Amino acid sequence: MKFTSLSIASLFLVLINSAFSQKENNTHCSKRDKQTTQLKSASLTVSQIAQTEKYDVNFYLLDLNMTNISTYLSGKGSFKATALQAIDSALYELFPTLTITTIKVNGVNVGYNRVGSAIKVPVNVAAGANFTIETTYNGTPPTAITNPLGGGGLTYDTSPSWGNHVVWSLSEPFSAYEWFPCKQSLTDKADSCQVKLTVPDTCKAGSNGLLENIVSLGNGTSRYEWKHRHPIDYYLISVAVAKYVDYTIYANPIGAPAPIMIKNYIYNNPATLPNFQADINETADFIELFYGMFGPYPFEDEKYGHCMAPISGGMEHQTMTTQGFFNKTLTAHELAHQWWGNHVTCASWSDIWINEGFASYCEYLMLENLYPVEKNQFMLDVHDNVMTQNGGSVWVLDSLNENRIFSGRLTYDKGSGIIHTMRYMMNNDSLFFATLKNYQSSFSNSTAHGVDFRDVAQTTSGVNFNPYFEQWYFGEGFPTYSVRWKQVGNDAIIRITHTASKPNVTPTFTNPISLKIARQGLQDTTIRFDISANSNDFLISNLGLIGNNIIVDPANWVINDFGSVAQDNTLSLQESIAEANISVVPNPNNGIFSLNGLNETGILQLYNMNGQLLKEMSVEPNQLIDIKGTPKGTYLISITLSKGNKTLRLITI
């Protein structure tokens, strides 16, 4: 979900960038791994939530009468469920001001107990038994004024740009119960849903899945019958009613079994579609791009699409996003949610990064591939926004605070930025995109925590991301880097230091960092440095004479601020590093060489002059190292020993 301006009624924190963002304490990671912050409805007590966990929802059916000029609704909401243990009652939610006419359990009228939003009905079934609860109800859902805990689950408004009257739903995170009876638990996805909407003949009604039928009722109304046959979380079930026109296009991804339908319900205003048509058409390009990056579009047997509503952004309702307007980053963001948030959903609101951090990073991926001239400024803006304040973690401690859950700075921008850095740490796009696909397949149609993505990334790439997650996902702040250097003949001593913006929480950041070094009479070179402390010294052999410029993180991979860069002729290496008097023998060579002076087992990393890691291996004293098959040229090798790190130049001929 993304919003561009603050609506007092919505409680969503948003950013000032066009179409940018939606509607903090540290504990030890071992206590957070796989921790389930309560899967909360903001309106239920802990004991009431526990009662809802005694059954599993399989199917939702909504059969509602609605218009486009009022949020008043009437009809039936039912769900089928399976008892997870023997139960004598079932508890679910519906907003207390909505009037209940009858409740049926397995087709039989029953009495019920209603306390606030909690409705408790007798069920009396054994473990594994199925049951159906049908609630007939009517009324006007609350606004933010009448429900301070939420509001806006169902909204009526008029488009200020186009004049169209619209009623639409927006249930994330806790507002589904404001307009239909449900169980608000992230980890209990229904297997499918059906939404039947009876609306005036002048309107269309959009929802999830396929439009199976439009039934004219002969009284000035028609019933739109939608069916979605995939697992779906409660907050992704949607309705939108307005005077729409249907503009349907198709995407044709490589490898897809058939074209993918993109059904767009656009305001029935002669100027609206012409204004947005080119932008809407790009949706097909984005589906084709993401299909290759993440795996098949999860709902390719049904559709993707949009329903317009007067919101300042979008909401990723499953298979049919509700969107206020169309531009490339907003449309890409909401589409990306079909993978990141819908196909795989955060298992708790504390892990909203699974949804919003990844959808935000998909904006960058779209620009990188389709509008590459815009990608650098986009990521720079993301980093700059994160650094407008010193603290804050991506992981959400207060999972009932909607402003914090949907923080544009932390959930969206920092969440996006730390994925970008993980890609840099892997230093291999094949592994990075394999990680994304492996994660999608591992948690298909299910839910996951942030640490689940960490584990998939580690397994796929071989990179240890445990310290990184402690510092960047659970931790707070960002580093400010400074560089000092000293020329020693043709070699250079480089000292990289960093301070932390929130040192009482995260004092040190141990992700690698790259420096682009200008050299006199030679091509600039980019060297990647492994950071282990707030101050690290490196000896770069045969670097050449340093020129007038050293740039920290030239490609913008890491959220960081700039301190200073200066020549410092007082620098001297720590003795332990200076003692590592190691050289490449012979040099130049034909791709086979040894490390003279190496007296312990170490780790060798081979980089090209652009700073790209080509090989990593363990090396022993007196070992012949074979890199034949690498193109002839100049390389840098980094040797990590118990006493420090040394970088040498290597030439193959």
Task: Annotate the PLM regions.
Residues 1-29, 573, 612, 647, ...:
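Bacterial Sec-dependent N-terminal signal peptides
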Residues 408-494:
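Amphipathic alpha-helical substructures
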